[in-house]
Amino acid sequence: MAGAFLIRRSWRRFRRLFDDLALCPLLDYRAYRQTEGKVYRFTGRLESVTGDRTLWIRGDKLTVPVALAGAETYVLPMQEGGGQGAIFDPGEEAPERIRWDRVSTLTDEAKVFVGGTLEMRDDCRIFAASPGKPLLLIFYDGPDRSLAVRAIRAGRHRNEYWNPITPYALVLGALFLIFLALSFLPRPAFHVTALVAFAAVFIPLFPMGPPGVLFTVAYRRLWLQARIFRAYRDLARLPLIYLEGGTGKSCLPGNEQYGAVSLDDLPGEAEGGNIPLLIPEEEKRKKDRWFVYGALPEPGGRPFEPADVFAVYGALPGEPEALARRYIRKACVFEIAAWLLLLTGIGLNALFVRVIIALL
């Protein structure tokens, strides 16, 4: 259980860090030559990894070094499947966190996003992590403009209750129960206690045995749906990075005006794919209005695609905070239902085993 909270917290931190970097300026040649100690974003392609743990990223007009030591490095999973549903599905795989020594095994020309502090080291400006100043590296494929949505959508664990800590917890629990059973076994008065302890060793296997395995399958489906709703919640909140309350206007890091317009009907451009939907159209309620986010045009026009490729551009089927509250409620309902099904399956299997033992 503790591992589940740690895993969920780590992915929440990943998404928050990416959101914070969206408000930082993009690094260009002028800033690279004149500033240090400030936080920037930069994108390019993997050029090389040198022996001193330095990654070189080649952009359009600039090549910058990145100190891999201490960097939080992730590989974004490729989008699987096709069709409209796959666009919004966070997928079953979370971004993979990798060690610095695995970076050199990645394909040459892989796309890279880096965000963090630009420091001066050995007379060279370099992206580097330091205490209180994290450095985020993301390797990805596909269009740059899709990275922000994909990172927030997929940046969550498949199932927090099965994580890297879980196998160790199960082994330690099993060893403790075996030790408990062996300590009580020589005492005739505690034979039942010893048998119960031995039986408890196999409780983690109960969800996978018949007939309760059907409940486990249903549990996994409900849990995946809850994960999708949590992704929708975070996607609905994406525009709030730039606009407090989801309305009004603000200025992007590149001094471009950013804002939203509220419409009764979905613009025709969206039907042709020119305005991406951040959440499926089917999620809209009749009383809600469409909110289109992007760079602000002249008064009376609709927002258009910002020059900053990481700025959110798209339409939401409702007000962001209201959508976020709706999806978190749905996610909680599905998670509770999933747990009830799983526990029901375990109880059914326990009853099944008890009946078999009684017949023997």
Predicted segments, located by residue:
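OB-fold and OB-like single-stranded nucleic-acid-recognition modules
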Residues: M1-L360
